[in-house]
Amino acid sequence: MTVDDDIEWRVTPGLSPYAETVAEMEARAAAIRAGEARELIWLLEHPPLYTAGTSAEADELLLPDRFPVFRSGRGGRYTYHGPGQRVGYVLLDLDRRGRDVRCFVAAIENWVIATLGDFGIAGRSEPGRVGIWTGHGPDEAKIGAIGVRVRRWVSFHGFSLNVDPDLSHFSGIVPCGLGEFAVTSMARLGIPAEMAAVDAALRRHFPAMLAGLRCSTRSDKDS
């Protein structure tokens, strides 16, 4: 048995409506907490929309009528979801895997970075800036976003990775409150990857992500 044999992997084809998806995700998180459902990694795409995290500021929504806007219970600020972007919802029981939210976020970052590495893309994290970054100097850009919530030590929401979305759609917001940085994608970097190949890489690196949840220091943060 591998470390993730008891975790369900779900890949939903097409475009998943946001409100219905979040409702199902929250119900699943509650069921995991109650011991009534398996943990879940849920990979999907959404139709074009903006979501506002708990730290979002009103002036960061530049074009409020462009796409539907949803208030989200995740951490972070405004982000865009749409076709060509792989969204991963990560529903794990951190009560059994390590009660450390910072460690959890870092593990997701490292997971996405390792996935990008399979395609020859050097991703990295940056101190003080949650997310995944590529390039340096004038070429520095964000390729992946992370926004999570933890309730009673069960995580939900997760990450997004720009495979080949319409990057012009990000112009309706200040992405993650960082207006001075560009947004990029695998396709923009010259890597026209199929979504199935990205999913396979995520699955390949998932055991290391789980192992990364056990940090040497533990968080006392209430959830």
UniProtKB/Swiss-Prot annotation:
It comes from the Bacteria. Residues 35-214 form the BPL/LPL catalytic domain. It catalyses: octanoyl-[ACP] + L-lysyl-[protein] = N(6)-octanoyl-L-lysyl-[protein] + holo-[ACP] + H(+). The active site is at C176. Pfam families: LplA-B_cat (PF21948). In the reaction, the free carboxyl group of octanoic acid is attached via an amide linkage to the epsilon-amino group of a specific lysine residue of lipoyl domains of lipoate-dependent enzymes. This is Octanoyltransferase. The lineage of its organism: Bacteria, Pseudomonadati, Pseudomonadota, Alphaproteobacteria, Sphingomonadales. The gene is lipB.
